[in-house]
Structure formats: C-alpha cells, structure tokens
C-alpha cells in the first residue's frame, strides 16, 4: 500500500525553518548595531562648557550692539591678529566700511565670503581683510597674515581661534600660498572628499611655507585668511588652516590650552 504524503507535517517543518532563519538574522543585526554603537561612543566628543557659553553670550551681545552683521571673532595667539568678523550679501561693502560703521579705505572690516555658511561648517571658509603694510603703524586687519611667509614665524604661531555665538573653533596653520587675485583655487563648492583633497594637494604644491605635521584629508574642514601683498595689490597671501575636529578636541585642548588664550591687542 502506498504511503500517503503528510503535507501538514511538511508545512510545519517549513514554518519552523523560516522562523529559525529569521531569528538568526535578527540576532546578527542586533549584534552589528551594538558594535557600531560601541565604536561610535568610544570616540571622545567635545562639549561646550557653560563657562564658554556664558563668555560667548556676553561677547557677542556687545559686538552685535555695535554691528548686527557680526558672525565671529578671529585671533591668532602670539600675534596682533585680533578682529571681529562680519558677513553681508556682497564682498565689497566691508572693503572700506569699518566695524563701527565709518568708511576708511584700506581698513574696512574682516569679512566672511558672502556665500559661506556662518557656522564654519563648509569644507572651505574664506575670510578677507586688508594688510595695512609697513607704512602704517598698526597691525590691524590681516596685516600679520603676511608674516606667515617666513617658516620660523609659522612654526611659532601655528594656531588661530574662531569664536562664534555658539562655540569656539580651533585651527592649525597648514600652509601659506602667494597667488594672483584671479587664482582658480578660489572655490567654495566641492563634489566630494576626493575633489576637496585634490584641491588642497594642488594648492599646497607651490606653498611658500608649510606645516608638514598637518596631514591633508578630504573630510577635514579648512579656513583661509586672505589678504593682499604690500609689494603688489594684485597678489594675495592665503593662509590655509585645518579645523580641529570634535573627536580630536579634548586631546588638542589638553595639550595646547595655555597657548590659545585670548590677549587683546586692538
């Protein structure tokens, strides 16, 4: 007599197999998620202290009373670079308009490029300021940027601090280039990390001075301080600085905190 095939038994076996496979996939997925979370949380994150928040709140409240287009404050410890930063809807107004609202040619105000984000989150942020030159007794605006064309000066003054209403950003000088004002390296937008790294690499090739301890990486953010040269107003000194990322911030501050203090010079 032929055996009757037990379809119900086969169906039960199939259901059990499916349940086991689904369970295994779920467990593996949970395991991967935990691994990712653990790896991410192992990176130190930077938290803005209450002391810093209070300081910045007071600082920018006072600056904004004088000029409501204030977006930042920039200083380079050990130099006389010590200026508020503004941004408006063009790159001409602050060439001669002072922070207080007057008009003084070859003084003006340090300003951010009109197309940059105010929060310094762009891959490349541009700040522009006049170089007062040797004929003027002060060091206002970006006069001291030109001094970075000497390697010894760069080595002694590596850091620049940007204060914003929300937090401070710290930068390390990477290299200084001397280029025509029409340089093709003046860009703000990049397709991806590779495109940005290519730009940085090409710019650095002909740099006048370099900080070789700064490794170029396409996922970093950079700041450029741009000013004219005294010998030729159509030539620019562009100081490229790497922003210290948050996952390096705690170690950076522990090592360099005393070198970063603000000392008023203006």
Please give the residue ranges for each predicted region.
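C-terminal motif of bacterial Sec signal peptides marking the signal peptidase cleavage site
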Residues: 26-29
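Short, conserved catalytic or interaction motifs in soluble domains
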Residues: 32
């Amino acid at each position: 007599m032929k055996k009757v095939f037990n379809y119900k038994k086969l169906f039960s076996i199939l259901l059990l197999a499916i349940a086991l496979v689904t369970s295994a996939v779920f467990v593996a997925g949970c395991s991967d998620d935990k691994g990712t979370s653990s790896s991410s949380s192992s990176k130190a994150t930077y938290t803005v202290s209450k002391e810093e928040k209070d300081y910045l709140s007071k600082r920018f409240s006072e600056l904004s009373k004088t000029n409501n287009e204030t977006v930042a404050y920039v200083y380079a410890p050990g130099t006389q670079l010590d200026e508020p930063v503004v941004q408006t809807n063009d790159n001409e107004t602050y060439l001669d308009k002072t922070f207080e609202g007057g008009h003084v040619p070859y003084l003006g105000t340090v300003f951010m490029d009109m197309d940059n984000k105010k929060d310094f989150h762009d891959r490349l942020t541009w700040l522009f300021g006049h170089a007062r030159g040797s004929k003027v007794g002060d060091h206002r605006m970006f006069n001291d940027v030109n001094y970075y064309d000497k390697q010894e000066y760069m080595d002694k003054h590596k850091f620049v601090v940007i204060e914003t209403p929300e937090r401070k950003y710290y930068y390390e000088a990477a290299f200084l280039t001397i280029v025509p004002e029409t340089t093709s390296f003046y860009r703000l937008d990049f397709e991806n990390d590779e495109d940005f790294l290519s730009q940085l690499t090409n710019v650095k090739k002909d740099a006048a001075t370099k900080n070789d301890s700064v490794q170029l990486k396409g996922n970093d953010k950079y700041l450029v301080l741009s000013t004219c040269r005294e010998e030729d107003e159509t030539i620019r000194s562009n100081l490229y600085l790497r922003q210290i990322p948050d996952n390096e911030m705690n170690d950076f501050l522990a090592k360099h905190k005393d070198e970063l203090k603000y000392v008023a010079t203006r």
